[in-house]
């Protein structure tokens, strides 16, 4: 008997996921279908649903349970609205629906893909759903095969939801009434990202730039005794602004001159705070398995620092740790709620959960764009050709199998090139990606050699750890 649940996330990074008989069998970001980066909309991504179901050979009528997530809303108020949207689009479909809290969906996405029997779960993002008029900012759960239970939570002011406005990241524009509003760690990182001239969802640029700078502030992170620590809107912003005032420079000149140092400053603060929180959680709850989720944990420098500081823990981060992983958590929670059964070990089912394409469809696409190609029946022969091209410093567009979940290109939809040529990074950034020269790339090695090259504390299959290189 087929017991199938559908997970849906609306907002930014819309996504769809499918659980069948306790196993995740499909997950797809809407941006892969609508070709709109981060696919932002309150609308249900029906085309993405249909594409994934067609690929999996599942009818909408086979689905019994639906889980829905959003962000920065009282999610339970949306149940009737989205039930009506689904039942109006898919006629004569009988299903049960549950709206899942944003941070709980993050927790489910990472714990149920970890393979752990029991774990601490730490969620940190820009903001989750509303809690008494405020937004979730950091949450801690204890998870086992029976349930995921919230044990601690911190909230932030809902007034700072849109940080792109000048009154939230440039001190003279800040309303005095806002200065002491609480803000999440991830939101603080986003705030500094705007301060140094980047845009929404470009915190990864700040992380990349941070490696070129030096910390401007000697942080004295307080001892963490619970999750109710102070982090206000003006913190770091005010100190950097005072440095600008004493610099004798114009504000744009100051920011441009010191932007890598400002980036490094927020990176160091984030690392120190999160490491202190993790230490507090390990000490209090005496659990050495830790699952992480939320957009903050796309920061691979931070993630490696956690393992470097606490080498005895077992760490899992879902490859779709941002909001594109929400649908996975929603599907798991819907299945768990309505089926009321223990979910199976899904750690081996990730990250390749999207759609694959037949050779004929690929040929048709190449011919539609008048692109030349050679077709190889032999995989061995194809691999030799690829290896030869890489050796000759040619750049490979690698497209194979089912697409990855999450924002990282994990060799199913990847650009691959020779890392031994010193000019390759700059060449790809300039000629292929058309982006800033400081943007990094990830090295790829066979798993058996990963600790030969890198100071890894555990394996890194999802491009979510940034270890140092062994000499």
Where do the model's predicted regions map?
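Extreme N-terminal starter segment of soluble prokaryotic enzymes
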Residues: 1-6
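Flexible beta->alpha loop and helix N-cap segments adjacent to enzyme active/binding sites
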Residues: 9-38, 83-99, 104-107, 111-235, ...
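N-terminal phosphate-binding loop and adjacent alpha-helix
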Residues: 32-58, 274
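Phosphate/pyrophosphate-binding loops at sites that engage ATP/ADP/AMP, CoA/4′-phosphopantetheine
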Residues: 48-64, 277-287
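Short beta-strand-loop/turn "lid" adjacent to the catalytic site in phosphate-handling enzymes
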Residues: 54-89, 95, 108-109
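Short glycine-rich phosphate-binding loop at a beta-alpha junction
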Residues: 60-73, 286-295, 396-397
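Active-site cores of enzymes that catalyze phosphoryl transfer or operate on phosphate-rich substrates
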Residues: 208-268
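Phosphate/ATP-binding catalytic cores across multiple sugar-kinase/actin-like superfamilies
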Residues: 264-290
């Amino acid at each position: 008997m087929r017991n199938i649940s559908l997970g849906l996330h609306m907002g930014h990074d819309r996504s769809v996921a499918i659980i069948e008989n306790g196993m995740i069998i499909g997950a797809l970001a809407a941006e892969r279908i609508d070709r709109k980066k981060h696919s932002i909309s309150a609308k249900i991504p029906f085309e993405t649903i249909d594409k994934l179901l067609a690929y999996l050979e599942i009818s909408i009528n086979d689905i019994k349970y639906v889980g829905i997530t959003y962000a920065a809303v009282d999610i339970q108020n949306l149940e009737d609205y989205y039930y009506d949207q689904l039942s109006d689009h898919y006629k004569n479909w009988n299903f049960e629906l549950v709206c899942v809290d944003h941070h709980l969906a993050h927790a489910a996405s990472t714990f149920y893909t970890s393979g752990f029997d029991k774990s601490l779960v730490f969620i940190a993002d820009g903001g989750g759903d509303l809690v008494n008029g405020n937004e979730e900012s950091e949450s801690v759960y204890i998870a086992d095969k029976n349930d995921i239970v919230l044990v601690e939570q911190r909230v932030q002011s809902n007034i700072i939801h849109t940080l792109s406005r000048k009154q939230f990241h440039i001190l003279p524009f800040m309303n005095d009434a806002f200065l002491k509003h609480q803000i999440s760690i991830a939101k603080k990182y986003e705030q500094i990202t705007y301060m140094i001239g980047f845009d929404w969802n470009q915190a990864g640029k700040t992380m990349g730039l941070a490696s070129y700078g030096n910390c401007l502030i000697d942080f004295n992170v307080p001892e963490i005794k619970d999750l109710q620590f102070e982090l206000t809107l003006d913190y770091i912003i005010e100190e950097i602004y005072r440095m600008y005032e004493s610099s004798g420079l114009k504000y744009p000149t100051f920011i441009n001159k010191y932007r890598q140092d400002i980036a490094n400053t927020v990176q160091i603060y984030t690392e120190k705070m999160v490491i202190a929180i993790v230490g507090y959680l390990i000490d209090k709850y005496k659990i050495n398995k830790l699952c992480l989720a939320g957009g903050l944990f796309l920061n691979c420098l931070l993630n490696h620092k956690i393992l470097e500081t606490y080498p005895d823990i077992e760490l899992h981060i879902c490859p779709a740790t941002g909001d594109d992983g929400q649908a996975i958590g929603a599907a798991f929670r819907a299945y768990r709620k309505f089926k009321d059964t223990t979910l199976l070990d899904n750690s081996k089912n990730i990250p390749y959960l999207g759609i694959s394409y037949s050779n004929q469809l690929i040929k048709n696409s190449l011919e539609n764009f008048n692109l030349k190609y050679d077709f190889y029946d032999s995989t061995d022969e194809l691999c030799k050709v690829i290896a030869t091209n890489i050796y000759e410093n040619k750049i490979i567009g690698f497209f194979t199998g089912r697409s990855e979940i999450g924002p990282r290109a994990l060799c199913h939809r990847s650009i691959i090139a020779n890392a031994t040529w010193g000019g390759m990074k700059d060449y790809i950034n300039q000629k292929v990606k058309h982006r800033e020269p400081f943007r990094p790339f990830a090295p790829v090695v066979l798993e058996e050699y990963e600790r030969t090259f890198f100071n890894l504390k555990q394996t890194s299959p999802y491009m979510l750890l940034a270890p140092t290189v062994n000499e």
